[in-house]
């Protein structure tokens, strides 16, 4: 009992002496994206997410925001997928979010734009309408780089065309 009381008192004392930071100082990344587009992308990317791995970053989706787009990547060391979405970027950056949890949050969010704020401790706040979720992410540096295809011819095609060809 005494140990708990001391810990609580010590925590209160630290809280009093720690200078609170302003919210804008904590923002590491911030963007807004259409829910429908994000939901489709995350659902597709889950196919390349590893479910049983000793590398925690592979259980997540790497989210990078730059210019006017999001780049989402999933990779299980055998299959890698990457997709881009248009987005409103307030602060560029990158984070890894656990794919299963992130997909569930996006799926259950209201049909409104989704805003994601990430602070300097990789805490992501996901807001849509009146819904607000906070999850802990991982540093983007932990995500392995996708292999580069160098000596091959490449083509670009619309996603829907590729899907229809595979079916």
Which positions does each model-derived feature cover?
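Structural preference for solvent-exposed beta-strand-turn elements
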Residues: 3-167
């Amino acid at each position: 009992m005494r140990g708990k009381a001391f810990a609580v008192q010590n925590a209160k004392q630290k809280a009093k002496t720690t200078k609170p930071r302003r919210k804008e100082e904590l923002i590491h990344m911030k963007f807004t994206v259409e829910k429908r587009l994000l939901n489709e992308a995350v659902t597709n990317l889950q196919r390349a997410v590893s479910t049983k791995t000793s590398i925690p970053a592979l259980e997540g989706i790497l989210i990078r925001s730059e210019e006017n787009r999001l780049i989402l990547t999933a990779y299980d060391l055998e299959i890698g997928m990457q997709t881009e979405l248009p987005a409103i970027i307030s602060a560029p950056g990158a984070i890894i979010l656990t794919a299963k949890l992130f997909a569930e949050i996006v799926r259950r969010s209201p049909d409104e734009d989704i805003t994601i704020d990430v602070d300097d401790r990789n805490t992501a706040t996901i807001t849509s309408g009146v819904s607000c979720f906070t999850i802990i992410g991982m540093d983007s540096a932990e995500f392995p780089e996708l292999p580069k295809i160098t000596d091959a011819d490449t083509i670009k095609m619309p996603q829907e065309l590729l899907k229809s060809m595979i079916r």
